[in-house]
């Protein structure tokens, strides 16, 4: 019996030195690639000063970045350009969840968009457009609450098949 256990143990030990080779899994991309705003949440806090946990250097320049995402594949092989425009009609008859507060387009005097396009570089899946806030933004107390949004809309795309759309 002890001999059998020794042989089984020896066989197990020898088998452990033989291994299968693991190669990288390669999957094909989905049938089409899309772009979309990945996070549509009405509150973005701008934190001025130093933060030991997060890089808030953009905040300290009185800026934020509105991000777009690319999906439908494992690797973005193209430079993707998304055309955008501010569309205040997106806010019509829209209220913040759990309140009677209407979603109000931010006055255009409160900010400047760096461009009317969002670029997602080849090899990346996220890109953004910077928003520079003016002194008027910081002077308005309503900016401290869920009140204003920048109703940015994707209007066209080059380098991807379509803009992913849904209902609010």
What are the language-model segments listed below?
Residues 120-132:
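Short Pro-Gly-centered flexible turn/kink motifs
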Residues 114-120:
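Conserved interaction-surface patches within small, structured recognition/assembly domains
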Residues 21-109, 113, 124-127, 137-138, ...:
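Acidic/polar, low-complexity intrinsically disordered N-terminal segments immediately downstream
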Residues 16-19:
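C-terminal motif of bacterial Sec signal peptides marking the signal peptidase cleavage site
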Residues 3-10:
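Sec-dependent signal peptide recognition
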């Amino acid at each position: 019996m002890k001999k059998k256990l020794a042989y089984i143990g020896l066989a197990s030990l020898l088998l452990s030195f033989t291994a299968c080779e693991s190669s990288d899994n390669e999957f094909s991309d989905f049938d089409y690639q899309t772009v979309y705003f990945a996070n549509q949440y009405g509150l973005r806090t701008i934190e001025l000063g130093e933060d030991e946990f997060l890089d808030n250097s953009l905040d300290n320049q009185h800026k934020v970045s509105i991000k777009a995402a690319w999906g439908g594949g494992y690797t973005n092989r193209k430079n993707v350009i998304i055309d955008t425009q501010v569309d205040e009609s997106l806010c019509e008859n829209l209220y913040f969840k759990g309140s009677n507060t209407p979603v109000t387009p931010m006055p255009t005097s409160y900010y400047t968009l760096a461009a009317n396009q969002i670029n997602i570089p080849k090899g990346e899946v996220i890109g953004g457009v910077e928003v520079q806030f003016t002194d008027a933004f910081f002077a308005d107390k309503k900016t401290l609450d869920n009140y204003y949004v920048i109703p940015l809309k994707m209007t066209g795309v080059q380098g991807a098949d379509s803009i992913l759309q849904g209902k609010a």
